[in-house]
Amino acid sequence: VDVLESKGIDVFAHPLTVQLTTEQGAAVPNNTIKELKEAGSVVKFGSLELFYPGAGHAMDNVMAWLPEKRILFGGCAVRSLQSSSVGNLVHGDIHSWLNITKQLNKQFKSAVMVVPGHGDVGGYELLSHTEKLISDHLK
């Protein structure tokens, strides 16, 4: 955050991200997108749609959708095909994450590109892969 802001780049964050970084003593983004506070909220910036589906892999998951290009930026709530586990769940809610992933599977069937938080970009199959990893973890 500090590096970006020192270059004159505005950093925007979910309200919970600001709270968590403050509590952790980390660099705090200076802009909060207050409209994303509630699960299910969406904010549009031109053709870009930012949305907060709720707690998942992290409590402050923010995702982005470019409908014209059908690209979903899922962040850490979407696992790459190389991932064989759900990863670190210390700051997340796996039950909510499963519900979010099921919703994403229904809502973004038209996605031609899905960008996970880590690993290779893929397509819609990353959403079903993520759902399977979570379901397997909960067994």
Stretches with model-predicted labels:
Residues D10-A13, I33-E35, A55, L72-F73, ...:
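Short, surface-exposed linear patches
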Residues V1-K7, Y124-H129:
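Metal-dependent catalytic neighborhoods of phosphoester/phosphodiester hydrolases
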Residues V3-E125, H129:
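Metallo-beta-lactamase
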Residues L4-H14, L20, S80-L81, I100-V114, ...:
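Structured segments of extracytoplasmic/periplasmic soluble domains
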Residues P15, Y124-K139:
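Short, electropositive alpha-helical surface patch
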